Regions:
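Basic, Lys/Arg-enriched alpha-helical interface segments
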Residues: 1-72, 82-90, 98-117
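Short, charged interaction patches at domain edges and termini
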Residues: 78
Length: 117
């Protein structure tokens, strides 16, 4: 179900940090297609499945989840105008990475927190 406001606009606006833009520019085209699909879901779906977006425990951050074959990509998100991403109208994509292990999360969360400051 795609939900837009009465004028047909997206539910959420997405903003991109320089770090995310740099990461995205280096992706292969088939990976970019999956990223675009997931970003469209965030823009237009009111309720977001944990298949695509998940809250990071003990943080005010979320992760966008993109799977391409056996590769798992993650992008750290920040809901700008509400603590809950579902109620947020503005979402900032902070930094993206190819998930290799759970150790990656600690490093990437620190990078995301630095970007927010």
């Amino acid at each position: 179900m795609k939900a837009t406001d009465k004028k047909g606009n997206d539910i959420r606006e997405l903003y991109f940090s320089d770090e995310f833009v740099e990461f995205y520019s280096m992706l292969q085209d088939k990976v970019k297609v999956k990223f675009e699909h997931t970003m469209d879901i965030i823009r237009t779906e009111y309720v977001l499945s944990t298949k695509f977006v998940k809250h990071l425990e003990n943080k005010n951050l979320y992760e966008m989840r993109v799977s391409v074959n056996t590769n798992e990509y993650r992008t750290i998100l920040f809901a700008v105008d509400n603590d809950n991403i579902i109620l947020s109208k503005k979402v900032l994509l902070l930094n993206g990475f190819l998930k290799k292990s759970t150790k990656d999360y600690c490093k990437q969360i620190k990078i995301a927190e630095r970007i927010l400051k």
